[in-house]
Amino acid sequence: MTQSLADMRRDYTRDGLAEAQAPGEPFALFHQWFADAVKTEQVPVEANAMTLATVDGEGRPHCRVLLLKGLDEQGFTFFTNYDSAKGQQLQANPFAAMTFFWPALERQVRIEGRVQKVTAQESDAYYQVRPLGSRLGAWASPQSRVIAGREELEGLVKATEARFSDTQPHCPEHWGGYRLLPERIEFWQGRASRLHDRLNYRLVDGQWLRERLAP
C-alpha cells in the first residue's frame, strides 16, 4: 500500500442541502437526487446500486450490494431468490436498511423500514422483462447454498436450458420481489471539513417529519 489509510481523504465542496431545497416528503427529493445520479455518475457506477442490510435470527447483520428495480409511493423494490440467505433473514426479521452512495455528487441516501413481499403478479411482470439468461439463472442457481465448484453451477444451467428448450421459463415460486416500506430516509450531502448536511425524514403517525441532524 503506497498511501497510509489515515491519510486517504477528500474534501467535499460540490454542493449543499438546505431546508429550502427539500420538500415536505422524501420521495420527491429521492426522485430528484436519483435523476441527478443517473445523469452524473459514470460507468462502472450504477445509479440504482445500493447496499442492503439485513439481520438474521441470531441478531447478526449482513449486507450486500443489489440493484433497485422499483420505486413508488409505497416504497423501494428489489428482487431475489426467496430461499437465499437474505430471503431467510427477512423471513426471520422483516426489517432492513438500504444505502445509496453517489460519489460524483458527494451524496448518500439511507433508508430504513419494514420489508414485505410484492405480489406474485408484480414479480412475474419484472421476471418476464429480464434477459433470458437471468430468467434461466433464477431456476438454475440454488442461491447461497454451498456447491462443489463452477462446473456444478454450469451443469445446473445446462439442465435448466434443456428443461425449457421448448417453452419460455415462467417465474419460479422461490423467486420474486420485496418492497421496503420506509419509516426513515436520510439525505446526506458532503460538505467541507466534514461538516456535512444531513436532512432526516421520519414517518410519525402517517406524516413525514423533516429534521436536520448534526454531522
From Swiss-Prot:
The EC number(s) given in the record are 1.4.3.5
Identify the InterPro entries for this entry.
Answer: Pyridox_Oxase, Pyridox_Oxase_CS, Pyridox_Oxase_N, Pyridoxamine_oxidase_dimer_C, Split_barrel_FMN-bd
Q: Which reaction does it catalyse?
A: pyridoxamine 5'-phosphate + O2 + H2O = pyridoxal 5'-phosphate + H2O2 + NH4(+); pyridoxine 5'-phosphate + O2 = pyridoxal 5'-phosphate + H2O2
Q: In which pathway does it act?
A: Cofactor metabolism; pyridoxal 5'-phosphate salvage; pyridoxal 5'-phosphate from pyridoxamine 5'-phosphate: step 1/1; Cofactor metabolism; pyridoxal 5'-phosphate salvage; pyridoxal 5'-phosphate from pyridoxine 5'-phosphate: step 1/1
Identify the Pfam families for this entry. PNP_phzG_C, PNPOx_N
GO BP annotations listed: pyridoxine biosynthetic process
The molecular function terms of the Gene Ontology recorded here are: FMN binding; pyridoxamine phosphate oxidase activity
Q: Which cofactor does it need?
A: FMN
> Any binding details for the cofactor?
Binds 1 FMN per subunit.
Q: Which residues cross the membrane?
A: none
Gene3D superfamilies xref list:
Electron Transport, Fmn-binding Protein, Chain A
Binding annotation for FMN:
R64, V65, L66, L67, L68, K69, F79, T80, K86, Q108, Q143, S144, W188, R198
Please tell me where substrate binds in this chain: R9, R10, D11, Y12, K69, Y126, R130, S134, R194, L195, H196
User: Keywords assigned by UniProt?
Assistant: Flavoprotein, FMN, Oxidoreductase, Pyridoxine biosynthesis
State its role: Catalyzes the oxidation of either pyridoxine 5'-phosphate (PNP) or pyridoxamine 5'-phosphate (PMP) into pyridoxal 5'-phosphate (PLP).
PANTHER family, per database record: PYRIDOXINE-5'-PHOSPHATE OXIDASE, PYRIDOXINE-5-PHOSPHATE OXIDASE
Family statement drawn from the similarity comment of this UniProt entry: Belongs to the pyridoxamine 5'-phosphate oxidase family.
| Assembly and interaction partners | Homodimer.
- This chain belongs to the protein called Pyridoxine/pyridoxamine 5'-phosphate oxidase
